[in-house]
């Protein structure tokens, strides 16, 4: 019997804005047609891919989704997969989001990130007694500042 995988950490909404060109400081550029909204971050990206690869694989999501429309969107998207357990997702504060500027000419992207609840996610937010999985995956460390704090024994809390 499969025990499954827990995907923990960032739950992010990515809003992608196609732009004509990257402007210099104090200059203007136009946002063109094709603005998109999608889920992102380690939890959403990893768990949805795993759910599609094996619909029978038990999966557990752990992280923060805000008490806002973006948090509702994150839960709705992950909720499309019957094998994703959302019981360890906490609703708190604002949902993390990234405004992605996608240059139509060069295809390069620039990311503006708002941490939201992800800034406070830490080991105390994981119900270790309830969690019964074979694999625990967590990320993205640089977007989880509470877990990136120094630790005398291991270097950082996440280590």
For the regions a protein language model found, what residue spans apply to each?
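Glycine-rich phosphate/adenosyl-contacting loop at the front of the ribokinase-like
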Residues: 1-64, 69-79, 144
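Ribokinase/PfkB-type carbohydrate-kinase core domain
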Residues: 1-13, 72-90, 102-159
């Amino acid at each position: 019997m499969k025990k499954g995988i827990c995907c923990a950490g960032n739950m992010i909404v990515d809003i992608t804005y196609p732009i004509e060109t990257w402007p210099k400081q104090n200059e203007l550029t136009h946002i063109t047609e094709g603005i998109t909204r999608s889920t992102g971050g380690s939890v959403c990206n990893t768990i949805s891919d795993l759910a599609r690869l094996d619909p029978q694989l038990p999966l557990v999501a752990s992280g923060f989704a805000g008490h806002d429309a973006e948090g509702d969107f994150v839960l709705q998207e992950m909720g499309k997969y019957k094998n994703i357990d959302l019981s360890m997702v906490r609703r708190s504060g604002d949902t993390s989001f990234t405004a992605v500027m996608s240059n139509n000419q060069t295809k390069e992207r620039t990311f503006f990130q708002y941490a939201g609840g992800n800034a406070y996610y830490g080991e105390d937010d994981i119900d270790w007694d309830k969690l019964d999985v074979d694999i625990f995956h967590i990320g993205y460390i640089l977007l989880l500042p509470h877990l990136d704090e120094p630790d005398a024994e291991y270097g950082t809390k996440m280590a």
